[in-house]
């Protein structure tokens, strides 16, 4: 019979990073990494679709006041200064950005006047491993 192994993860490190900080303080609670952060914009309407990797933050401003739908995909949240600049560009609340950087956040949905915010877990299985992997989607 196959043996099931359970991995126990410590959650004290991520909460300890935020302890004593005022609400809205931008602290990344995920795994430390040095990988490059990649920002990709998906801009779409019922008739069009545009995908663009952003290399300069100034390129984000053209998506701010458009009438189409815009999805900002950020692969890598460890550069909090970059996340803060993106939040400033789109007038996102610091509490919302804090939720994005908290990779242990429970699923939720917040409705704002001009945008929708949700956070949830995306689950995947690596075919070459027997582990279940998950990442946060916000």
Descriptions of predicted regions:
Residues 1-138:
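Peripheral, non-transmembrane regulatory/ligand-interaction domains of membrane transport proteins
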